[in-house]
Amino acid sequence: AFEAIMSELETTLLEADMGHIAVDAVLSEMRSKLIGSPLPKKGDVGHLLDATLVSALDSLLRVSYWDFDQTIETLLDEEPPVVIMLVGVNGTGKTTTAAKISYRLIQRGLSVVLGAADTFRAGAIDQLSDHAERIGARCVKSQRGGDSAAVARDAIDSAKARGDDVVIIDTAGRMQNKTNLMQELKKVHRVASPHIVLFVGDALAGNDAVEQARKFQSVLHFDGAVLTKLDTDARGGAALSIAHATNRPIVLAGSGQEYQDLIDFEPVHFLTKLLSEDIDPSAFKIFGVDAQ
């Protein structure tokens, strides 16, 4: 019965777009927790396994977790402007995420400068500039094909000169296996010395997002991830795989098309959405959450 239920849980996780390596790691942790443990009085093996699974996944998502807003506040006290660099392949919603983060900070009374350092993608500079105008941020830019690192430097210098609080640098995202892209990003990173590097991944990309995260992590050592399009039909298991593959947390998630649709990534609520159809909802009660 034990192995049969474990096999069902494995299928559930794989169908949720969680990668094989992360699934194996979670099931291995479950086995180590369960072997030798006494069964509940009613002998309810299924419930015990479900609760252990939720606990294991929650632990995985909380590895190295940090709170976005608190971190910004701490950094502002130490050394304004706070510099945030966004990285990720094209099509993940990186530029829109830059605008959403800016909007979030502006709503809290902070001043934001956007650095249009994606000088490669057609329309990227205009897109970011349009967002900046709508949300009340300044945008520092150059012509298409310009020096990305110089744009980042100019944005930071401009923020320092005007006393702005935060600089958000949007970067190019041609496919992650292009060496020249990675060299360009390393140059931007070296020049900008960002306080925070965020990887932007698409919840719909599944295991492709995990591979992208792994490659960006090997080059830039990002601090956390933003998972976009979490409001879609994506199961979202990629979040678990990204956290496992990079040892970095998902800190924010895109939850819609509007500027305000950027939420703190909350592991337990994410897991209830991911698993509540497949496992006993009472398994979430260890966190005081009703998954009904």
Where are each of the predicted segments found?
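Basic side chains
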Residues: R31-K33, K94, K100, R121, ...
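Short hydrophobic/aromatic residue motifs in ordered secondary structure
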Residues: H20-A22, R121, D231, Y259
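Primarily NTPase-proximal linker/entry elements flanking Walker-type ATP/GTP-binding cores
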Residues: A1-A117, A124-R144, A150-I169
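Short linear motifs at secondary-structure transitions and domain/linker junctions
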Residues: V54-S59, V87-V89, D118, A172-M175, ...
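Extended, compositionally biased non-globular segments
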Residues: I279-Q292
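Conserved catalytic-core segment of NTP-binding enzymes
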Residues: Q127-L128, D147-A161, R174-P281
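Hydrophobic transmembrane signal anchors and adjacent membrane-proximal interface regions, especially
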Residues: L14-D17, P194, V289
